[in-house]
Amino acid sequence: MASGILVNIKEEVTCPICLELLTEPLSLHCGHSFCQACITANHKKSMLYKEGERSCPVCRISYQPENIRPNRHVANIVEKLREVKLSPEEGQKVDHCARHGEKLLLFCQEDRKVICWLCERSQEHRGHHTFLMEEVAQEYHVKLQTALEMLRQKQQEAEKLEADIREEKASWKIQIDCDKTNVLADFEQLREILDWEESNELQNLEKEEEDILKSLTKSETEMVQQTQYMRELISDLEHRLQGSMMELLQGVDGIIKRIENMTLKKPKTFPKNQRRVFRAPDLKGILDMFRELTDVRRYWVDVTLAPNNISHAVIAEDKRQVSSPNPQIMCRARGTLFQSLKNFIYCTGVLGSQSITSGKHYWEVDVSKKSAWILGVCAGFQPDAMYNIEQNENYQPKYGYWVIGLQEGVKYNVFQDGSSHTPFAPFIVPLSVIICPDRVGVFVDYEACTVSFFNITNHGFLIYKFSQCSFSKPVFPYLNPRKCTVPMTLCSPSS
């Protein structure tokens, strides 16, 4: 009965705007009362839409500001009502022991629970240290106040971590988007050359973005949940600290355990200095190389082969293709002239018909599917040397050979002058070739004394360059198919 009356009174002194108990109540001449802050805010809102018109938010009857008056009577009722927070039934439930029905007056230090005098004498609490609630309330008030300050500090840290993770997420998105833009821009000039590299790098960046942003999004969600948990815990503590002594101590063990068990989880981050940084494959270098190849191709000459009595290579009718005959057949046909296959291999070299005595000259040779070859420039054969010189002995710049070659299908070499200890044997230097060339470009700058070799298959990558060549006499294009019977072909300028 009394509880119902209190409910009715509460409804009468509740603000129709904020639906809370009236604060500094003001009444209009129509009889409706509102919180001072609520009716003031409503008045300002009304002025924005209907100039000069003010009406009651409940009944819409117009009023003038001078007709608003403080309602002291309602304010007193609200003040009294605030003191009556619980109904007798609810008070009975909270203030009395649920097991024994006795009033809760004691606090068990070991179990950190509010108990009655019968609980104190029960087996559950026998031997425990118990105190009157008034004796421990201040101690726990200090503890909870300290915990509240600690939680507020951690909340600030959590909010900062949450902001940092959002900032890092945005930073990653911007940085990776920027990388995408750079990749697209860098590859634009070399689209035909770098289609594969572009696609590969973009896929890596997409995967990196997906993995990192997915992880950061998960971390962000965890940080939001962590922050929300702290807010709820802080709200609980604030409610206890602002409430009665009973509310402060009721269930305090649970909340203290929650505080003690709570740890601030920091999000997983990705140090930018450890990430896989995109590195374009030296786009400027490739562009310069591509331009260099374009430049030297301006000096392309139509080279043909010159048959001679020294070489036993097979030259096609168009004089553009040379191949090695079957060595065993040739040896049987020549009888004792060739004592070994090594001597025979030396005799498969041929010269181009054009002599080079000045200027710049360029040509390309198709060596696809060959397992062995030698090509470059030569100052001319030594007619009497073919019978007594070993396979590679002749291929030295000092003997007029500036050449590179392939052996056993995978070994690319450049032939340089032998050392002072082995003057009759060339110094064979391995070449690092990432993509095996099916087509090789040769460029001779006679005045600059250089011979350059380009991997046309790898977009004109420079294979090797001879510098300070001693061109004391005319030089000729040189091709040697070696013992591989697959032909070598001189490419026409229009190919």
Swiss-Prot record:
Keyword Zinc: yes
Modified residues (Phosphoserine): 87
Name of the gene: TRIM5
Pathway: Protein modification; protein ubiquitination
The name this protein goes by in its record: Tripartite motif-containing protein 5
Assembly description: Can form homodimers and homotrimers. In addition to lower-order dimerization, also exhibits a higher-order multimerization and both low- and high-order multimerizations are essential for its restriction activity. Interacts with BTBD1 and BTBD2. Interacts with PSMC4, PSMC5, PSMD7 and HSPA8/HSC70. Interacts (via B30.2/SPRY domain) with HSPA1A/B. Interacts with PSMC2, MAP3K7/TAK1, TAB2 and TAB3. Interacts with SQSTM1. Interacts with TRIM6 and TRIM34. Interacts with ULK1 (phosphorylated form), GABARAP, GABARAPL1, GABARAPL2, MAP1LC3A, MAP1LC3C and BECN1.
N-acetylalanine carried by residues: 2
Organism listed in the record: Pygathrix nemaeus
Keywords (A to Z) from UniProt: Acetylation, Antiviral defense, Autophagy, Coiled coil, Cytoplasm, Immunity, Innate immunity, Metal-binding, Nucleus, Phosphoprotein, Transferase, Ubl conjugation, Ubl conjugation pathway, Zinc, Zinc-finger
Role according to the record: Capsid-specific restriction factor that prevents infection from non-host-adapted retroviruses. Blocks viral replication early in the life cycle, after viral entry but before reverse transcription. In addition to acting as a capsid-specific restriction factor, also acts as a pattern recognition receptor that activates innate immune signaling in response to the retroviral capsid lattice.
Start and end residues, zinc fingers (RING-type): 15-60
Segments forming B box-type zinc fingers: 92-133
